[in-house]
């Protein structure tokens, strides 16, 4: 089992944001005063149902929607069986003559029912087909299971319906016009009246998000740390990403809720996974479980594949007939949705961001049409269109032309060909501006590798972005291939990472009082998971492998603070937000250099400063991007970056009329009303429509504010990276040996122990020759606490890392050892208590 060695260390809880005296609070309520919603045991499921009912626009819409899902499954199975066994295709294709007349010389008119077999013949053909009977039995069992689940869900959601009516006081007719922030604010208030959770006197917005997104946060962290096998290098195709709904379902089945999963229930990780003494045994158990689930997927592959093909055919056949170019459209891939998702971001919040970025993303990808392909498409459209025009003209002259064999088929195929060819012909009025489009995309999706900036016109950037924003046809093809590929990925790619996954859940799980076991990354704690290149320098104590990649901790914290302005962040997060606010003020003040003549004047840049609070919020982003793109080559690259940062800071300051005059120190700037009341959580108006309109407008301002912060933080990150290029690590790609470690050779004296074991997925710092004393202190502390440094005793010095040829990271000038330091099977590690994160 030496191949399972990995380098994770225990991550201790960092802070407590519970009110003084409530760390171990257990609220007691007299028996007679208990409400129906007092002490709900499974709050994860309860809050998830509350959220789902809100997103499905009420009980009636949810009920009808699930009924149609049952009917849809039944229709697909029944209609497919009818087409296979109850249709005489010889009559349908006119290979067999049917005569309804008593006189053979009279003309025959075949009707559609003539091709239907009698019920007795149809039943006999079904009974003779053994494979069809097997498929129908399996489909019937599955449908009955879904029917029972539907009835159970209806009973459960009726309780949620009552909760909305009586506890939250929101009628179902008004629910479609209430934002989630309004519902969430009423849940927080309901906790004070009904004590939904007895372990805390008050619920916070973060508590509710943790309950709803517990497993989703783990998935985002696993993708962020590149622990799931999603990237593959194929001959002739290069590096590809494969992540489908079926593969994601299997990941969640294995890790979260399936039989033998890592979690005891929805809110608690099993006790044995919280300690390191049995890590190898647990990894072997997980590896075996992955193997059996992979074998089960392989056995069920034919049935799943048939269902995928039938469902895709019935779903997209009509769309292709109506819009042949639909498959040429693009959509956000499942990997892109997981990669771009913030910690603690609900599904509708993510969808809203991606919807805003869809049009600029489509325009960006359309900039890369091949000139040769365009030439072929123009000529193909000309030839196909010419033939199509002649056939249409003949049909208009005499409609009997359609009665000629294959004429209608030819017309249809030619129409599809013309439509497809036109999709490859660019708009003659389109302007090629990939850098500007990529910056607009960044404003909405918030995440982007550094090497994309300045290289938006390169095909490599386009290919990497296509992994996030793929063709609809590629999405359908991947879903069709998923039943075949998923068992192979589980058996041959996921199993070797069993120990890394076990260590990940042990080291990055904290127990939050009143919430349960959550992913520590979801705490958005810049001290434990911040990155020094993302404005967290001096505020983070995280080692390299404890840092979240791509600035996800910092951007997630900013997004959550803007989305939930009533949330009180912990001390370290408050300091980070306060520092960022001060930096925005300084850079915004520096934007006045344009009026002083020190920098070239720009009309678009000047228009930003004249924007008022009632202006269209999205115009701020357009002005910032356009102003930064129109300066020309007269400015140096560094000066352009500084001016762009000043533009964004000036745009952020334009939100000041919406902010209250006296905001708490460290609070993030929020879109608020002039009276200081957060209108995103409590809309008011003379009617439901006025309140809904006000909520939507303020939501747009909040989204624009976050977009500007994303641009600003990326610009700061870029400048800090250029200042210390040797320290920057972005998007650490997996190697062929990721997840595997070589077996140990020799004894303890064969090599010098490393402070942090190295792996193929995470870089680590090794002792530098120039600082032996500091390294000794730092290494000794890291060996015990996984790289967390005491800020009061051990200063953090800059580290220099280089990529190893076969994966992994080592410090410049130091030899890379292939043997990580072993984690003891028994002993002191097993004596450590489970982590308790008091919130």
UniProtKB/Swiss-Prot annotation:
Modified residues (N-acetylalanine): 2
Intracellular or extracellular location(s): Preautophagosomal structure membrane; Cytoplasmic vesicle, Autophagosome membrane; Golgi apparatus, trans-Golgi network membrane; Late endosome membrane
Post-translational modification as stated in the protein's UniProt record: Ufmylated in a DDRGK1 dependent manner.
Residues on Lumenal side: 85-128, 398-406
A Gene Ontology BP annotation from the UniProt entry: programmed necrotic cell death
Membrane topology category: Multi-pass membrane protein
Residue intervals annotated with topology Cytoplasmic: 2-61, 155-290, 302-319, 329-371, 425-470, 481-483, 493-839
Bias type Acidic residues, positions: 737-747, 823-832
Organism superkingdom: Eukaryota
One MF term in the entry's GO annotations: phospholipid scramblase activity
Catalytic activity: a 1,2-diacyl-sn-glycero-3-phosphocholine(in) = a 1,2-diacyl-sn-glycero-3-phosphocholine(out); a 1,2-diacyl-sn-glycero-3-phospho-L-serine(in) = a 1,2-diacyl-sn-glycero-3-phospho-L-serine(out); a 1,2-diacyl-sn-glycero-3-phosphoethanolamine(in) = a 1,2-diacyl-sn-glycero-3-phosphoethanolamine(out)
Motif (Tyrosine-based sorting signal): 8-11
Parts of the chain in the membrane but not crossing it: 291-301, 320-328, 471-480, 484-492
Annotated transmembrane regions: 62-84, 129-154, 372-397, 407-424
Region Disordered, residue ranges: 657-686, 717-839
Coiled-coil segments on the chain, per record: none
Biased composition (Basic and acidic residues): 724-736
InterPro entries associated with the record: Autophagy-rel_prot_9
Keyword Phosphoprotein part of the UniProt annotation: yes
Function: Phospholipid scramblase involved in autophagy by mediating autophagosomal membrane expansion. Cycles between the preautophagosomal structure/phagophore assembly site (PAS) and the cytoplasmic vesicle pool and supplies membrane for the growing autophagosome. Lipid scramblase activity plays a key role in preautophagosomal structure/phagophore assembly by distributing the phospholipids that arrive through ATG2 (ATG2A or ATG2B) from the cytoplasmic to the luminal leaflet of the bilayer, thereby driving autophagosomal membrane expansion.
Domain note: Forms a homotrimer with a solvated central pore, which is connected laterally to the cytosol through the cavity within each protomer. Acts as a lipid scramblase that uses its central pore to function: the central pore opens laterally to accommodate lipid headgroups, thereby enabling lipid flipping and redistribution of lipids added to the outer leaflet of ATG9A-containing vesicles, thereby enabling growth into autophagosomes.
Protein name from the UniProt record: Autophagy-related protein 9A
Protein species of origin: Mus musculus
Gene responsible for this protein: Atg9a
């Amino acid at each position: 089992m030496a191949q399972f060695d990995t380098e994770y260390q225990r991550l201790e809880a960092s802070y407590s944001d519970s009110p003084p005296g409530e760390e171990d609070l257990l609220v007691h309520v007299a028996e007679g005063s208990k409400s129906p919603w007092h002490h709900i045991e499974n709050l994860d499921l309860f809050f998830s149902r509350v959220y789902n009912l809100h997103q499905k626009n009420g009980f009636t819409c949810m009920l009808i929607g699930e009924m149609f899902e049952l009917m849809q499954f039944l229709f697909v199975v029944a209609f497919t069986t009818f087409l296979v066994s109850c249709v005489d295709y010889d009559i349908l294709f006119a290979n067999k003559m049917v005569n309804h007349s008593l006189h053979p010389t009279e003309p025959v008119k075949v009707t559609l029912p003539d091709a239907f077999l009698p019920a007795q013949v149809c039943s006999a053909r079904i009974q003779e087909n053994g494979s069809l009977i097997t498929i129908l039995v399996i489909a019937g069992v599955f449908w009955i299971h879904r029917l029972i689940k539907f009835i159970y869900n209806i009973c459960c959601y009726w309780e949620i319906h009552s909760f909305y009516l009586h506890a939250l006081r929101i009628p179902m007719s008004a629910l479609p016009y209430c934002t989630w922030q309004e519902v969430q604010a009423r849940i927080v208030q309901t906790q004070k009246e009904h004590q939904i959770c007895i372990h805390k006197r008050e619920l916070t917005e973060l508590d509710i998000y943790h309950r709803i997104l517990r497993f989703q946060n783990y998935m985002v962290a696993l993708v962020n740390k590149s622990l799931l096998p999603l990237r593959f290098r194929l001959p002739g195709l290069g590096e590809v990403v494969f992540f489908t709904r079926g593969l994601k379902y299997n990941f969640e089945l294995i890790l979260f809720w399936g039989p033998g999963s890592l979690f005891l229930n929805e809110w608690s990780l099993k006790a044995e996974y919280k300690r390191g003494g049995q890590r190898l045994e647990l990894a072997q158990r997980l590896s075996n479980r992955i193997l059996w689930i992979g074998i089960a997927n392989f056995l069920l592959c034919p049935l799943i594949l048939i269902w995928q093909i039938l469902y895709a055919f019935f779903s997209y056949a009509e769309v292709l007939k109506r819009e042949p170019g639909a498959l040429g459209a693009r959509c956000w891939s499942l990997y892109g949705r997981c990669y771009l998702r913030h910690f603690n971001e609900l599904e509708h919040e993510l969808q809203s961001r991606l919807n805003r970025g869809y049009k600029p993303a489509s325009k960006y990808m359309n900039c890369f049409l091949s000139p040769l392909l365009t030439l072929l498409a123009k000529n193909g459209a000309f030839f196909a269109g010419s033939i199509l025009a002649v056939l249409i003209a003949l049909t208009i002259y005499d409609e009997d032309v359609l009665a000629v064999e294959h004429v209608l088929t030819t017309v249809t195929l030619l129409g599809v060909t013309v439509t497809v060819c036109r999709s490859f012909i660019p708009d003659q009025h389109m302007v090629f501006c990939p850098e500007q489009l990529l910056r607009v995309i960044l404003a909405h999706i918030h995440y982007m590798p550094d090497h994309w900036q300045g290289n938006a016109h390169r095909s490599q950037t386009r290919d990497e972005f296509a992994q996030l924003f793929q063709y609809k046809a590629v999405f359908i093809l991947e879903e069709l291939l998923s039943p075949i590929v998923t068992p192979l990925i589980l058996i041959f790619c996921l199993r070797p990472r069993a120990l890394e996954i076990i260590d990940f859940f042990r080291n990055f799980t904290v127990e939050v009082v009143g919430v349960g076991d959550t992913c520590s990354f979801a705490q958005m704690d810049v001290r434990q998971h911040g990155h020094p290149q993302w404005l967290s320098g001096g505020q983070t104590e995280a080692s390299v492998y404890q840092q979240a990649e791509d600035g996800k901790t910092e951007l997630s914290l900013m997004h959550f603070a803007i989305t939930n302005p009533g949330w009180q962040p912990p001390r370290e997060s408050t300091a980070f937000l306060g520092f960022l606010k001060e930096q925005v003020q300084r850079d915004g003040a520096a934007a006045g250099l344009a009026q002083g003549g020190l920098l070239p004047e720009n009309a678009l840049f000047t228009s930003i400063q004249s924007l008022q609070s009632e202006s269209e919020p999205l115009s701020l982003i357009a002005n910032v991007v356009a102003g930064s793109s129109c300066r020309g080559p007269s400015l140096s690259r560094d000066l352009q970056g500084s001016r762009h940062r000043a533009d964004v800071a000036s745009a952020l300051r334009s939100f000041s009329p919406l902010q209250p005059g006296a905001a708490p120190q460290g609070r993030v700037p929020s879109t608020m009303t002039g009276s200081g009341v957060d209108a995103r959580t409590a809309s008011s108006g003379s009617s439901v429509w006025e309140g809904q309109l006000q909520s939507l407008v303020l939501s747009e301002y909040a989204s624009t504010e976050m977009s500007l912060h994303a641009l600003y933080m990326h610009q700061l990150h870029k400048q800090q990276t250029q200042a210390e290029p040797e320290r920057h690590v972005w998007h650490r790609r997996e190697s062929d040996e990721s997840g595997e470690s070589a077996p140990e050779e020799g004894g303890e004296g064969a090599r010098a122990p490393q402070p942090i074991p190295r792996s193929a997925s995470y870089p680590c710092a090794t002792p530098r020759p120039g600082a032996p004393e500091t390294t000794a202190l730092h290494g000794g502390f890291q060996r015990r606490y996984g790289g967390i440094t005491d800020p009061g005793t051990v200063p953090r010095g800059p580290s220099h890392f280089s990529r190893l040829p076969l994966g992994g990271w080592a410090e410049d000038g130091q030899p890379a050892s292939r043997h990580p330091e072993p984690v003891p099977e028994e002993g002191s590690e097993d004596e450590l208590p489970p982590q308790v994160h008091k919130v």
